[in-house]
Amino acid sequence: MEKPLTVLRVSLYHPTLGPSAFANVPPRLQHDTSPLLLGRGQDAHLQLQLPRLSRRHLSLEPYLEKGSALLAFCLKALSRKGCVWVNGLTLRYLEQVPLSTVNRVSFSGIQMLVRVEEGTSLEAFVCYFHVSPSPLIYRPEAEETDEWEGISQGQPPPGSG
């Protein structure tokens, strides 16, 4: 009996190019346990033709954690010029971070949401891709407040005396 594959559900969004940025992305991609490369190069498993994207921009790398019988994943930055933002962390060239169940990734103008659904197969995993019509990542902007206007001007700041 075949073991169920681990599933990565990947939503993609680009703010200016929209869905056309992902015209060559298949709806489903099954892959063995080697790193899945994303970039604009011919050797990338997921090819995106975007100007700021490196030929090998990032990889999704399956691995086995000690004591676990399930595939885990990390995301590795492969671009020497650009950086990759993952769940609030900025990754530079060859830095990597383990993925959790839900992950927010941003690079080269692309927003990507990756959901990991565990399966028991150790031979392969499958990615399902969805192009989102709206932003996937919201970074709150700093708000201006009147907080400082209520402080008396005659008092020295704390720690200055």
Swiss-Prot record:
GO terms for biological process: auditory behavior; cellular response to cAMP; cellular response to Thyroid stimulating hormone; cochlea development; cochlea morphogenesis; craniofacial suture morphogenesis; genitalia development; genitalia morphogenesis. It comes from the Eukaryota. Residues 36-91 form the FHA domain. GO terms for cellular component: cytosolic large ribosomal subunit. SUPFAM superfamilies: SMAD/FHA domain. It holds the Pfam family FHA. GO terms for molecular function: deubiquitinase activator activity; ribonucleoprotein complex binding. PANTHER family: TRAF-INTERACTING PROTEIN WITH FHA DOMAIN-CONTAINING PROTEIN A FAMILY MEMBER, TRAF-INTERACTING PROTEIN WITH FHA DOMAIN-CONTAINING PROTEIN B. Inhibits TIFA-mediated TRAF6 activation possibly by inducing a conformational change in TIFA. Interacts with TIFA. This is TRAF-interacting protein with FHA domain-containing protein B. It comes from Homo sapiens. The gene is TIFAB.
